[in-house]
């Protein structure tokens, strides 16, 4: 067994899903001492129909039994509530749209979980993420790379990981395609081989997002206006909407008027008719107004420049300015951009082509080829000057601290 695969104590985050199960199996086959940890990160809905935690633990325990490893149930719910969920609520309250999975990875799975694993004497941790870690021999730094399966790559969610975290982390299934992972699970008889992949935010489950958020943030109704200032209806609270949103606006039957259609034609919008769908374009917290526009290619939905804050760089220092690629949302195709400036805290990107519905609170993540450089939280993007300025001076009441 070579040095890379010399026997080590490795703690695997077993979620009950097939990816982490195959991760544990592959490491056990390599001769490592593997210990499974099931992370319980949410307990507010333990008795509800939306909580799958108990079922997931049963699945994880069954996997551990088949593979022949120990499994421990560890409760990180308090850490999750303090470090992830509280920030999630603050961001929504301020009119932004956060990505809690990114914060969960940085604060829970690769911090609290990593710390727990080290206390167990682990040399490494491993998870079922579709990403790769590579040590650059010339720089001595650990690089975060996209997973080999482009349809499953999760490096976007991992861009906040630092050198200390990456040096202790393995992503075995990042070297595989999902079809191979399913095949391995089926061949060795894993009980969750055909289990459906989890989707969405873990603590929300399958319930309607608005119903969940309304438990914590009070409704604050206000007007819905189009780009010419016409009132089209009433919203339930700005926190319950995100830029680019099309469904759930309650104005599906509203048609554009003649003057509005002419204005769209003058802007060069192609194919805009009175029955075109409406999209959320801006949330103005000063006036509690939800601004919507008609047509997917409306200029209010297009941005070529964005600024990001709270940046985190995998190498530990900001990359040099220059051409690279970026994603402003998960599953987006890499977009060519110029990194105009970058510090340890902020960066500015200029895109070769307009980006659709760039959303404050989401993350802009930078790449050079398959290498993820890091990124930051989108703070603002360039939009027409006629668009009202977003302010956070007036925010809805936070029901639960």
From Swiss-Prot:
Residues annotated for ATP binding in this entry: 13-20, 39, 128
Q: Give the catalytic activity.
A: S-sulfanyl-L-cysteinyl-[protein] + uridine(34) in tRNA + AH2 + ATP = 2-thiouridine(34) in tRNA + L-cysteinyl-[protein] + A + AMP + diphosphate + H(+)
List GO molecular-function terms, semicolon-separated. ATP binding; tRNA binding; tRNA-uridine 2-sulfurtransferase activity
Which residues are responsible for catalysis?
104 (nucleophile), 202 (cysteine persulfide intermediate)
Q: Name one Pfam family in it.
A: tRNA_Me_trans_C
Region feature (Interaction with target base in tRNA) = 99-101
Task: Give EC number(s), comma-separated.
Answer: 2.8.1.13
Domain of life of the native organism:
Bacteria
Decide whether keyword 4Fe-4S is in the record. Answer: no
> Where is this gene product found?
Cytoplasm
Q: List the disulfide bonds.
A: 104-202
What GO biological process, any one, is recorded here?
tRNA wobble position uridine thiolation
Site annotation Interaction with tRNA: residues: 129, 362
Looking up InterPro entries in the UniProt record yields: MnmA-like (IPR004506), MnmA-like_C (IPR046885), MnmA-like_central (IPR046884), MnmA-like_central_sf (IPR023382), Rossmann-like_a/b/a_fold (IPR014729)
Listed A to Z, the keywords are: ATP-binding, Cytoplasm, Disulfide bond, Nucleotide-binding, RNA-binding, Transferase, tRNA processing, tRNA-binding
Matching PANTHER family: MITOCHONDRIAL TRNA-SPECIFIC 2-THIOURIDYLASE 1 (PTHR11933:SF5), TRNA 5-METHYLAMINOMETHYL-2-THIOURIDYLATE -METHYLTRANSFERASE (PTHR11933)
Name the family the entry cites.
Belongs to the MnmA/TRMU family.
Q: What is this protein's name?
A: tRNA-specific 2-thiouridylase MnmA
The source organism is Polaromonas sp. (strain JS666 / ATCC BAA-500)
């Amino acid at each position: 067994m070579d040095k890379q695969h010399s026997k080590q104590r490795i703690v695997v985050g077993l979620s009950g899903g097939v990816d982490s199960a195959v991760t544990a199996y592959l490491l056990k086959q390599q001769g490592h001492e593997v210990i499974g940890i099931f992370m319980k990160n949410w307990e507010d809905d333990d008795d509800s129909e939306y909580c799958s935690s108990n079922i997931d633990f049963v699945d994880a325990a069954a996997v551990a039994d088949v593979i022949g490893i120990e499994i421990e149930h560890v409760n990180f719910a308090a850490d999750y509530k303090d470090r992830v969920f509280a920030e999630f609520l603050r961001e929504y309250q301020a009119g932004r749209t956060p990505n809690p999975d990114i914060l969960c990875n940085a604060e829970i799975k690769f911090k609290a979980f990593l710390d727990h694993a080290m206390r167990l004497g682990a040399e490494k941790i491993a998870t079922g993420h579709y990403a790769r870690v590579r040590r650059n021999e010339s720089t001595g730094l650990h690089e975060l790379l996209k997973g080999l399966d482009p349809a499953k790559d999760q490096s976007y969610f991992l861009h906040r990981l630092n050198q200390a975290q990456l040096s202790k982390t393995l992503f075995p299934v990042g070297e595989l395609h999902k079809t191979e992972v399913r095949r391995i699970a089926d061949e060795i008889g894993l009980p969750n081989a055909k289990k459906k992949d989890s989707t969405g935010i873990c603590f929300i489950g399958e319930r309607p997002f608005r119903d969940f958020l309304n438990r914590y943030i009070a409704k604050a109704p206000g007007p819905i206006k189009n780009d010419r200032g016409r009132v089209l209806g009433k919203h339930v609270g700005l926190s319950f909407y995100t830029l680019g949103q099309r469904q759930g606006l309650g104005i599906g039957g509203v048609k554009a008027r003649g003057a509005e259609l002419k204005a769209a034609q003058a802007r060069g919008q192609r194919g805009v008719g009175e029955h075109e769908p409406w999209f959320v374009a801006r949330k103005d917290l000063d006036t509690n107004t939800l601004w919507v526009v008609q047509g997917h290619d409306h200029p209010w939905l297009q941005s070529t420049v964005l600024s990001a804050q709270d940046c985190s760089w995998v190498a530990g220092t900001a990359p040099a300015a220059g051409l690279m690629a970026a994603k402003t949302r998960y599953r987006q195709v890499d977009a060519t951009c110029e990194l105009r400036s970058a510090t340890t805290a902020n960066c500015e990107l200029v895109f070769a082509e307009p980006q659709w519905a760039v959303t404050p609170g989401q993350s802009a993540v930078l790449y050079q080829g398959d290498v993820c450089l890091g990124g930051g939280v989108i703070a603002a993007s360039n939009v027409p000057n006629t668009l009202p300025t977003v302010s956070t001076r007036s925010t809805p009441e936070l029901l639960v601290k």
